[in-house]
């Protein structure tokens, strides 16, 4: 059982706020996770357990493989995102090791600090 001062971190996704196409199931599940986290935070507040959603942006890692989409689906995704004003070719992407410190920072917050949502994104070089 968790005690007062414990911290729950749920990892969300920028996809619920960015105009991607063809990701409706993923986007919906991440939006649901954020709503669940909000409700859980309210339920656990009196017990002193904190809940934070870390909404992550695009990241890469050398061990991560590219999506295995067929060519036509990949083209529809790219064209749909472009139509929605999202240029995937110019979007900055962070290395996964660059953002892990955010999780440590959330865990190390003083017990009197409440941080419900954090958004992590890449910046242009």
What residue spans do the PLM features occupy?
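A short helix-coil junction within the Rossmann-fold of NAD(P)-dependent oxidoreductases
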Residues: 1-5
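Conserved SDR Rossmann-fold cofactor-binding beta-strand/turn motif
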Residues: 50-60
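Residue(s) in the substrate-gating loop at a strand-loop-helix junction
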Residues: 13
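Active-site helix of classical SDR
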Residues: 29
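Conserved catalytic-site region of short-chain dehydrogenase/reductase
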Residues: 16-18
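C-terminal helical subdomain
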Residues: 53, 73-125
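Active-site loop immediately N-terminal to the catalytic Tyr-X3-Lys motif
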Residues: 20-24, 91
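Alpha-helical segment proximal to the catalytic Tyr-Lys
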Residues: 42-43
